[in-house]
Every structure is written in C-alpha cells, then in structure tokens.
C-alpha cells in the first residue's frame, strides 16, 4: 500500500492519507512509550527490592504512567522572562521530531516497516543527530547557566560517542555489504553478527548508552550537578516532549541493536515455528532489560572520564575492529 501511495500522482487525498497514517503511528508510539516507561519502573523496583507503581490502575499500576501524562498536560506552561521565546517554544519540537522520524526506517519484521529506505542505517544515524540541535537550542534559549552547561555537555557527548558508534557498525556493513537494514537482517540468517562481531557489539552498546544520555553517561541532566540539566526551565507538556524524545530513542536504539547484531526477526536453530515478530519482541525486550540493568547498576562517571573513555578507549577499539573485520573478510570470505 505504501509503495502504491508513493508511486501515485500527488494529490490532497494522498496528503490526507499520509497525515492519518502519521497520526496513527504517533499515537501507537506514544502508547507504547507510556507503558514502556511503566515496565522500566517495575523492573527498577524489582531490582531494588521495591514494589514499584501499584496504586493507580489496580495491583500492577497500569494507569500510573497515564496519570503522570495527564498531570504533565495539566501543569502550568511557564516561559522565563529572560528566555528567547521563539526558540524556547520551538526547541522541544526540534528535539522530538527526529526521534519520531527514525522509527520509519526500522524493520520490525520482514512485512512490518513503515518505509524501506535503501540506506536505512545511514538515515538513522543522520536523523538521530538532529535531536542534539533541539537540546542545545533549548538550553541556550532558556538563558540559564545550568541549562546551558547541560546543553554543552549534551553536544560534547554526542560528538564524542557518535564517532565510535558509527565506527562500530562499519564491521556490520562490511559483512552484509549494504546500508539497507533489511539486507543486514537477511545477512544474519545463518549466523547473527553478535557472534562474528562481539567487539563491535560491545562498542556499539556502550556508545548507544552514551548517545541516549542514560546512566552511567547521564551527565547532560545530572541532578546533583545541574539541577535538571538542559531542560531545567521547561515544565508541563514542553518538558514532556524532551522526555518522550529520550524514551522513543531508548526503544528505537534497542530495536536497532536487535536489527544489527541479534538477527532481527530470525529465530534460533530448530525454533523456526515461532513467528518472527515474537523473536523480534523477545530480543528487543532483552536489550531494553540490559539498558535498564545498566541504569540500576552503574554510578555516574565524571565528565572528564566520559570524554577520555570515548576518545582514548572506544574509538581505538572500534578502529581495530574495522581492521580485523576487513582482514578476516579478505582472507576467509
């Protein structure tokens, strides 16, 4: 259906259909993120010996996050007098829009994908970097020293870890011979890339956590140092945009990890009778659990340690991985 719409003559009907599909996808994403946050809180509670949300929506707290969303929507929307008003208003949208856009290129099964982009991996890397513009814009427009420092940290962290993140997937590109995410999954039909690219997987995983600004790399919004970081002056639904962008990227990165290193929807040997969507969901959930585990386990690192680790450890390891992968492919494939 999507291919037919793309190839058809442009018309207002097509625009309306695309708009309706976009709104529907946005509602699905928001619903998934809402209950994804609840799942994270329950897992964190379990790991810390707590019950977690259990008051709103029954024993499992199923409506707790919904109540939190309603609370955010009802909160007063304040704009500081000294803020750059147009940029302050626009920044949350700039931060959230790319997070929503990257989902279009991610294949969840061989039949479930919004748009099959020939260079889906390149598209994801390019578009995801735009969110930092929104973060820095919001930090600067707030006219607050803590917000500005958080925005500068976010920009420095993104630059420092985007490089090893991209370098870590070059081994995957060498083995699959494509930037198309569907082709990358197809290349893992026999052997998942986590088996032949363990170093690349570790570098990608660490760099992904840093890109997501999650513990132990949550320096741009370190409460003990910066109050709330780059969004310290935001409240209500504008603050919710930043939070949603963070969690949409969180789940999108887990899906990308599944596609690049865990074989996507391909099953384990002798278990092909289980549908591909189930396999993708299981692998995706495993990666999400791993990210949550990191948040619970590790303490926050210092800013200088963060920069030093990215440039002096991850980047050289990623370069060595590229060299070894190219050598092995040349000799044995």
From Swiss-Prot:
Main localization of the protein described in the UniProt heading: membrane
Spans traversing the lipid bilayer: 17-37, 88-108, 117-137, 159-179, 191-211, 241-261, 273-293, 313-333
Catalytic activity line of the entry: a quinone + NADH + 5 H(+)(in) = a quinol + NAD(+) + 4 H(+)(out)
Gene Ontology molecular functions: NADH dehydrogenase activity; oxidoreductase activity, acting on NAD(P)H, quinone or similar compound as acceptor; quinone binding
InterPro entries associated with the record: NADH_UbQ_OxRdtase_su1/FPO, NADH_UbQ_OxRdtase_su1_CS
Enzyme Commission (EC) number: 7.1.1.-
Location of the protein in the cell: Cell membrane
Membrane topology, from the record: Multi-pass membrane protein
Record-level GO BP terms: aerobic respiration
Taxonomic superkingdom: Bacteria
Keywords of this entry: Cell membrane, Membrane, NAD, Quinone, Translocase, Transmembrane, Transmembrane helix, Ubiquinone
Annotated family: Belongs to the complex I subunit 1 family.
PANTHER family associated with the record: NADH DEHYDROGENASE SUBUNIT 1 (PTHR11432), NADH-UBIQUINONE OXIDOREDUCTASE CHAIN 1 (PTHR11432:SF3)
Record text on subunit structure and interactions: NDH-1 is composed of 14 different subunits. Subunits NuoA, H, J, K, L, M, N constitute the membrane sector of the complex.
Designated name of the protein: NADH-quinone oxidoreductase subunit H
Taxonomic source organism: Anoxybacillus flavithermus (strain DSM 21510 / WK1)
Name of the coding gene: nuoH
């Amino acid at each position: 259906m999507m291919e037919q719409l793309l190839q058809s003559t442009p018309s207002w009907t097509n625009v309306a259909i695309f708009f309706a599909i976009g709104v529907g996808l946005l509602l699905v994403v928001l619903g998934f993120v809402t209950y994804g946050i609840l799942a994270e809180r329950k897992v964190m509670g379990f790991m810390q010996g707590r019950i977690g949300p259990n008051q709103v929506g029954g024993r499992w707290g199923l409506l707790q996050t919904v109540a939190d969303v309603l609370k955010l929507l009802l909160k007063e929307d304040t704009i500081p007098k000294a803020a750059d008003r147009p940029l302050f208003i626009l920044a949350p949208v700039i931060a959230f829009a790319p997070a929503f856009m990257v989902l279009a290129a991610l294949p969840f099964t061989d039949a479930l994908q919004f748009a099959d982009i020939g260079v889906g991996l390149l598209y994801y890397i390019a578009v995801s970097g735009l969110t930092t513009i929104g973060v820095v814009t919001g930090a600067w427009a707030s006219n607050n020293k803590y917000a500005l420092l958080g925005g500068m940290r976010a920009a420095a962290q993104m630059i420092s870890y985007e490089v090893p993140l991209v370098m870590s997937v070059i081994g995957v590109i060498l083995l699959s011979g494509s930037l198309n995410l569907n082709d990358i999954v197809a290349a893992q039909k026999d052997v998942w890339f986590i088996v032949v690219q363990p170093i690349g997987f570790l570098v990608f995983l660490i760099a992904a956590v840093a890109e997501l600004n999650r513990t132990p790399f949550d320096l741009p919004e370190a409460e003990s140092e910066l109050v709330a970081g780059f969004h310290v002056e935001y409240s209500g639904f504008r603050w919710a945009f930043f939070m949603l962008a963070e969690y949409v990227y969180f789940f999108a990165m887990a899906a990308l990890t599944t596609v690049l290193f865990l074989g996507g929807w391909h099953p384990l040997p002798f278990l092909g009778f289980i549908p591909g969507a189930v396999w993708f969901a299981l692998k995706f959930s495993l990666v999400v659990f791993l990210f949550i585990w990191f948040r619970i386990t590790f303490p926050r690192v210092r800013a200088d340690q963060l920069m030093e680790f990215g440039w002096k450890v991850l980047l050289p390891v990623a370069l060595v991985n590229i060299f070894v992968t190219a050598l092995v492919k040349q000799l044995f494939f």
